Design a protein with these regions (language model features):
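Alpha-helix-loop-beta-strand connector modules within alpha/beta enzyme cores
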Residues: 40-67, 88, 109-137
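Short, electropositive alpha-helical surface patch
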Residues: 78-92
Length: 137
């Protein structure tokens, strides 16, 4: 979730049974990215600010980078977020099917969270997939 953690992961290798092991990829979570900024994990950190963290990581690592995008934002903003991340060289994104006010699953205190409808969530995934195909990924 930072250049430092990415550098540690990039350099970490262990030998086990005569075989060298290392991490296959990096994951940047919205939780850690928010907490590093002293903010709650409620989608308050905007993509433009998260890009700063992504650039630090990309600078020191050649490993594939997977980005947790929470809900992915509004359907209208979704393709623009994907385009920006594609241009940065992000390998994959993960989005949640939650709607309404963001509540981190780790800290939900028993509160129920609303899920998007299957049709809405499928539409978001299909739009994202279609847009990525247009970018020739």
């Amino acid at each position: 979730n930072s250049g430092l953690s990415a550098l540690i992961i990039e350099k970490t290798k262990i030998k086990k049974n005569q075989e060298e092991k290392e991490y296959d990829a990096l994951w940047i979570s919205s939780l850690c990215d928010s907490l590093l900024r002293g903010k709650p994990d409620i989608e308050v950190v905007e993509l433009k600010d998260r890009i700063n963290s992504l650039e630090w990581i990309i600078e020191v690592s050649n490993k594939p980078l997977i980005v947790d995008l929470d809900s992915g934002g509004s359907i209208e903003h979704w393709k623009y977020s994907l385009r920006t991340l594609y241009k940065l060289g992000i390998s994959a994104v993960v989005i949640e099917d939650k709607t309404g006010k963001k509540v981190n699953s780790l800290f939900q205190n028993g509160k129920l969270q609303e899920q998007d409808t299957i049709s809405n969530f499928c539409e978001k995934i299909q739009l994202g997939k279609h847009y990525i195909e247009q970018l020739n990924i």
